[in-house]
Amino acid sequence: MNEERHATFDSFLSLDIRVGIIQKAEVFEKAKKPAYKLRIFFGDEIGFKNSSAQIRNYSVNELEGRRVIAVINFPPKQVANFISEVLVLGAVTEEGIQLLMVSDRAKPGDKVA
């Protein structure tokens, strides 16, 4: 039997998870795996952040203007010639990553709890 790993509530609280809106999406040609470069707006207080996301089962048109949920306090990560600043969250399925649904009432920058 595999030993389960348990997170603590404090470790969950250490994550800054926010609602954002994808302002721009483009194919990330230099990434090793198929990916998009995303420019995401997290409200006036946080502003814009970049993400490299392996969510290629969506078109650019489906991504731009879409609300997403992202962890915004991981350290920036260099992906090829691009700095990814946030991790966009989704469900891992047989068809690829399915972005989490966000209510239209949620505004950019709202915290996720």
What are these regions (language model features)?
Residues M1-A113:
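Phosphate-backbone binding interfaces of nucleic-acid-interacting proteins
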